[in-house]
Amino acid sequence: MLEGFLVLKIILIGTLTITSYRAVPEQTKPECTGRHRCETSIGENVSELGVAVSPDLLASGRVHYRDCLYISGVGFRIVDDTTNSRLRNTVDVFVYEKAEEKAFGVRHLKVWVVQPDQK
């Protein structure tokens, strides 16, 4: 082990469906009004650094709340929310504006979990 260095373990989850969502009542909770009063599944305020993952990814044990994901072409994001239960193998990237959401569309990208190596 190298002293003073953090060793990371990078695990490929696979190629997943990547979409986007906004903090509006029809996509989250009735009390959500834009950026305010919208909490994620872990009780944090929504943020452009957060993503929602489909329940099947959480149930599989491959992904956990607060995990750091690297999404090809998107960057690093933190798992802080859950998508609708009907979705499978999906990550929703948070965006603020409707135009951003429309421009993002639906993508199929490689996703990795980045964790400190506990060895």
Give a label for each model feature.
Residues L2-F5, K9-K119:
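Solvent-exposed, well-ordered loop and adjacent helix/strand elements within mature globular domains
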